[in-house]
C-alpha cells in the first residue's frame, strides 16, 4: 500500500531476473527483448498496478489505468493473465506463456510458476484457490476450485490439483493430484 512496500517488493523480486548479470549483459538482454526482461517488465507493471489501485484521488485516477493498461498489454504479448492483489511478494515466473490466475485466488509469499499454469475456479463456483508460502508449480500444473495448499509444497509438472493438501513440505502430482512424497529440505531449498 505504501511506496516503501512497493520498492521492497520490487527489490526482492528483481533479484531473480537481474541479480548477477553485468550492466553490459543487462543492456544486451533489453535490446534483444530477452524473455526474462519482458517477464520482469510485466511483473513490475503488475506491482505498480497494485500500488496505484490502493491509492486515492488523482494518483489512483491517473496511475491505476495507466499501469493496468501496461500490465494488460504486456500480458497479452507474454500470455500471462493475473489480477492485482493475488500474489504476495516473492513471485517468480520462470517462463511466460499460458499463465492464468483467477482474480479471487490468494497466493502467499515466494510462489514459483514454471509456465502453462492455471490457478482458478472450477466453473461451478466463484471460489478460488488459496496457496501457502513457497509453492513451486511445475510446468503445466493446475490448481482448480475451492482448495487450500499448505506451505512448502511442490506441484509436479502436469498435475491437476482439485482438493486441499494441508500438510506442509510435500510433493504432489498426477491427475487428480495425490501426495508423492514428503518434502526434503536442504539448506533452505527443496531437493
Predicted segments with their positions:
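Terminal amphipathic alpha-helical/low-complexity segments used for targeting or macromolecular assembly
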Residues: 1-78, 185-191
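Detector for the N-terminal beta1/A-loop initiation region of ABC nucleotide-binding domains
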Residues: 81
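Left-handed beta-helix
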Residues: 84, 89-90, 94-103, 108-109, ...
